[in-house]
Amino acid sequence: KHHLEYHLRNHFGSKPFKCEKCSYSCVNKSMLNSHLKSHSNVYQYRCANCTYATKYCHSLKLHLRKYSH
């Protein structure tokens, strides 16, 4: 059922999940939770080989690939 609701929201442009801090809105709660990190000052993903730190796991993975740490 949830997959169908998500699918229909994508087709009809419905974005019921809204950020309380800015005008961002999205189709599901996990996307909103990811977006909320952009308002935080918490950089929980850190490179063990340099001073790089990020809010997002995928950004750290890209960093590690780019610099071959």
Curated annotation (Swiss-Prot):
ZnF segments: C2H2-type = 1-11, 17-39, 45-69
Please give the Gene Ontology molecular function terms for this protein.
DNA binding; zinc ion binding
Q: What biological processes does GO assign it? A: segmentation
Q: Which domain of life is it from?
A: Eukaryota
- One GO CC term of this entry? nucleus
Q: Where in the cell is it found?
A: Nucleus
The record's principal subcellular location, in a coarse class, is: nucleus
Its keywords, alphabetically, are: Developmental protein, DNA-binding, Gap protein, Metal-binding, Nucleus, Repeat, Zinc, Zinc-finger
Entry function = Gap class segmentation protein that controls development of head structures.
Give the family from UniProt: Belongs to the hunchback C2H2-type zinc-finger protein family.
Q: What is this protein called?
A: Protein hunchback
Chain's gene name: hb
